[in-house]
Amino acid sequence: MNLRFPILVFDIETLTDLKAGAHLYHLDLPEADVEQALTKIRRQESGMDFQRLPLHEIVCISGLWIDEKGIRLFSFSQEQNTEAEMLTKFLSIFDKKQPTLISWNGSQFDLPVILFRAMYHGLSASSLFDQGEIDNQK
């Protein structure tokens, strides 16, 4: 397979967005009880604990940037940035460069969550989603 530079290998880590979940399901509960209530609702809806994609708050975005100059590892986390700041930094990569994206389950989880959360924060992600997709899992 021929890859074009630059290449971005990336992954996100998420937690349940309790505030959005409480709003969506009209839960008037103490914050400490919201996650348990959301899990119960999700089990009733789908038989699984895994929350709907829009209810995943991004707490970390990490990437490996590969280009003609070398390799660079980066990470944006909730320790130093708000979710909106992490997304702004990550999405700005696509305004300047058009990297080849590599991820694990990116088209089914990471990219949809990034899109949902960008919309939630009023951010544009159009450059990211003009990438196309190569699915080697077939």
What are these regions (language model features)?
Residues 2-6, 56-80, 92, 97-138:
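Metal-dependent phosphoesterase core characteristic of DEDDh/y 3'-5' exonuclease domains
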Residues 1-93:
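Conserved RNase H-like, two-metal-ion catalytic cores of nucleic-acid enzymes
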